[in-house]
């Protein structure tokens, strides 16, 4: 049974001072017992003018609002849902991706850690998380919460945002503030304010590269002891178990997941991330759904319906093939989909894939974090890929400052991250750290009568922001780490290809640069370079499975000659001269490909493809994508 709980958000008259919120001046919230959930309702009267407005009740938005309130700003938190927590609660994604360095050091503290400690870390109980988020908000005197409040449009004065218009109880209401923080997962406020953005992999020419979304589902009747025994069992002939267990978390069943054949072709089951709840139920993050337009509510609803239609077959399959799930029964699905990527807003500083994988520091750092660059499966690519795994990197305050519009900041997965960098930076703990920084920045902006953009360009202001951040628990100590691959002679070529989205270093950052190249790998590299230049790829470069240098250079020179409208070389010496003339082969690369009967290593082919790309950019109608590096820098 749910307890009806008044939100305690009324404006209180106290000694002539109006205090909005539900903190120390109000009765303490009653903590419900067991699985009982606090039900939030809005106060009947609320002010319309604030110092800071935060849009969305996501974890990132909650962190931003609490931070702004703690720093003395009269803050309004707008939540379109009836409960707080977004992806963590309504999406039921309770498998926290905890940013830790390779030495095991926690990288994100502050408000994120307060929440994590309160709910017991990763694998938290969903109802406990909802109540914890509410109580964290309720404790802040300066913070007013509005639930079931749907953002409609920004209020603009030229290129400056001055507030927002929302819909509450069927009525349009306007709220005003000098600083607005967009914490919506998709950057809805920024987009409505006409901040430029790219979609999915558009910044590298892959706008249609939409990672699948996930529908988390809850099962009862799962034998936890069998599950943990299964995922930790070392199969015969193997040296390690497929999965593992950590408290209420278990992961594994990859073979079983990928072996499932869905009735819906635009769907896939992968390995299971399993989280046990306080009542013994388990939550599963395993079902990938494609062909969902995550910016369209109707498409998202259809995606959930498709997932729910597939689940009876999935559960039958699990009962028959997955140890520990023999008596599993579906309880429910999450209210919202787990969406990994939509918009990437253009900000003053865009976090790049090299920032991430070279563990770079930032002068205006507002958090330190890490996570594998995890690009999940797409409809055309059955398996996802891990581009690399950083030790730790910093995020710039400029990544929270959208271009074109003043008075606005953005936190969450749609902030100023290029599409590949977002594969790492999109996780919620990182977003909560950015949210906390945005709250501190809002305080400085209000006190100094400056915009976030002006603060970004103010060195003294940045230092004034970093000091209170650290005092309030943020972790800004960064350890510079140079990855071994960065000293490889072919690393500059790898960087170019990696920034195109074609490099799989895995969790150990091993790009196999010294391996002898295979025919398919060579073709993938050079065809990618041609494709990314925007030139014709009607006929792909093809070679045998085990080509020698002569075969590779002749096949490639024939394609490039065709693109340029010139005669193709007819022998190995001619192909070598062809590429030397175009500076695709420099002195070092010429030596690597000098023996026509030998086969170059992968590093040489990465350099060849990168230099080919640079050459092709000189051709008419070539395209230079903004997120792709080049060798001339």
Where are these regions (language model features)?
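Conserved N-terminal/central alpha/beta ligand/cofactor-binding core
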Residues: 39-43, 47-49, 67, 73-74, ...
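Glycine-rich Rossmann-fold phosphate-binding loop(s) that bind the pyrophosphate
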Residues: 55-59
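Short, low-complexity, disordered segments immediately C-terminal to signal peptides
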Residues: 23-40
């Amino acid at each position: 049974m749910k307890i009806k709980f008044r939100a305690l958000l009324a404006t209180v008259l106290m000694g002539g001072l109006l205090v909005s919120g539900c903190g120390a001046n109000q009765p303490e919230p009653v903590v419900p017992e067991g699985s009982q959930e606090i039900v939030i309702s809005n106060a009947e009267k609320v002010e319309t003018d604030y110092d800071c407005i935060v849009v969305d009740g996501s974890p990132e938005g909650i962190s931003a609002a609490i931070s702004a309130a703690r720093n003395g700003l009269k803050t309004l938190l707008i939540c379109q849902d009836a409960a707080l927590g977004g992806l963590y609660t309504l999406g039921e994604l309770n498998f926290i991706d905890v940013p830790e360095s390779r030495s095991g050091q926690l990288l994100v503290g502050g408000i994120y850690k307060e929440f994590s400690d309160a709910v017991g870390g990763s694998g938290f109980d969903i109802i406990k998380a909802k109540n914890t988020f509410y109580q964290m908000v309720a404790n802040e005197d300066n913070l007013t919460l509005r639930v079931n409040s749907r953002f409609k449009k920004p209020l603009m004065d030229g290129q400056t945002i001055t507030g927002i218009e929302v819909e509450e109880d069927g009525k349009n209401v306007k709220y005003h503030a000098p600083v607005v923080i967009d914490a919506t997962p998709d950057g809805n406020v920024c987009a409505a304010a006409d901040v430029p953005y790219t979609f999915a992999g558009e910044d590298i020419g892959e706008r249609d590269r939409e990672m699948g979304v996930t529908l988390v589902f809850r099962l009862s009747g799962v034998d936890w002891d069998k599950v943990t025994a299964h995922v930790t069992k070392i199969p015969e002939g193997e040296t390690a178990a497929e999965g593992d267990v950590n408290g209420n978390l278990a992961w594994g069943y990859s073979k079983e997941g990928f072996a499932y054949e869905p009735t819906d072709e635009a769907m896939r089951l992968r390995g299971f991330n399993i989280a046990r709840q306080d009542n013994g139920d388990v939550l599963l993050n395993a079902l990938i759904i494609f062909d969902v337009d995550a910016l369209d509510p109707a498409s998202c609803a259809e995606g959930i319906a498709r997932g729910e239609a597939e689940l009876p077959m999935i559960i039958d399959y699990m009962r028959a093939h997955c140890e520990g799930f023999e008596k599993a029964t579906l309880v429910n699905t999450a209210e919202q989909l787990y969406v990994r990527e939509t918009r990437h807003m253009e900000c003053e500083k865009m976090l790049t894939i090299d920032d991430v994988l070279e563990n770079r520091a930032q002068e205006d750092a507002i958090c330190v974090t890490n996570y594998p660059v995890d690009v999940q499966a797409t409809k055309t690519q059955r398996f996802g890929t891990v581009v690399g795994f950083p030790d730790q990197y910093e995020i710039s305050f400029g990544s929270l400052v959208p271009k074109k519009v003043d008075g606005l900041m953005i936190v969450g997965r749609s902030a100023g991250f290029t599409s590949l960098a977002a594969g790492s930076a999109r996780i919620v703990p990182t977003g909560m750290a950015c949210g906390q920084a945005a709250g501190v920045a809002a305080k400085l902006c209000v006190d100094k009568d400056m915009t976030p953009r002006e603060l970004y360009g103010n060195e003294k202001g940045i230092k004034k922001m970093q000091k209170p951040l650290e005092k309030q628990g943020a972790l800004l100590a960064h350890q510079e780490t140079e990855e071994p691959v960065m000293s490889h002679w072919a690393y500059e070529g790898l960087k170019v290809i990696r920034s195109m989205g074609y490099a799989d270093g895995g969790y150990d950052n091993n790009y196999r640069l010294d391996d002898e190249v295979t025919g398919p790998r060579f073709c993938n590299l050079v065809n990618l370079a041609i494709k990314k230049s925007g030139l014709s790829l009607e006929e792909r470069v093809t070679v045998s499975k085990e080509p020698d240098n002569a075969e590779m250079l002749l096949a490639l020179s024939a394609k490039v000659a065709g693109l340029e409208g010139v005669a193709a070389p007819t022998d190995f010496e001619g192909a070598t001269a062809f590429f030397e003339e175009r500076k695709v082969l420099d002195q070092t690369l010429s030596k690597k490909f000098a023996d026509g009967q030998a086969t170059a290593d992968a590093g040489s082919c990465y350099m060849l493809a990168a230099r080919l790309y640079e050459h092709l950019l000189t051709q008419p109608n070539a395209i230079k994508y903004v997120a792709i590096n080049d060798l001339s820098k």
